[in-house]
Amino acid sequence: MALFVIGLNHTTAPLALRERIAFAPSELNHALPELQNSLNDPDDTQANQPPAQLAVLSTCNRMEVYLSHAHEHKHPERAILQWLATYHDVPLSELTEHMYILQGESALNHAFAVASGMNSMVLGEPQILGQMKQAARIAFEANTMGSELRHWFEKSFAVAKDVRTNTAIGE
């Protein structure tokens, strides 16, 4: 499975754009399955390929789609960008100008930095870990969190705990 993070944050996008593409937690129960369906190829279902696994972290300072996808070569990041632009009625060109796309080890390292507060506007702020846990719970409830993505999130939570325990971050 290929791991991706597609998103924007306080360093890449102005507040006005972040507000336009933010999701309310209650909105994600419907939006996550819709996004998952847009990523799943009907041929994959027939070939017993696993569906895309995804979660969305949406806060005042960031919106990120965390994705575990079976087909690295199919460029799911393009489909996600198009879906986000359509869903939020934002021109694709405006959205892509401010988005980042991370894959593999870079995506995993980013998740570790976010969970531990190292990628926050205020270094070490503790709320982000709770927000990531909420994103994982919502994805689980929406049935878009599979074992691969769950493992990725659990590893991020463990790294965040280690960072808080073994460093002075957030003090």
What are the residue ranges of the model-derived segments?
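Glycine/serine-rich phosphate-binding loop and adjoining beta1-alpha1 elements at the start
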Residues: 94-171
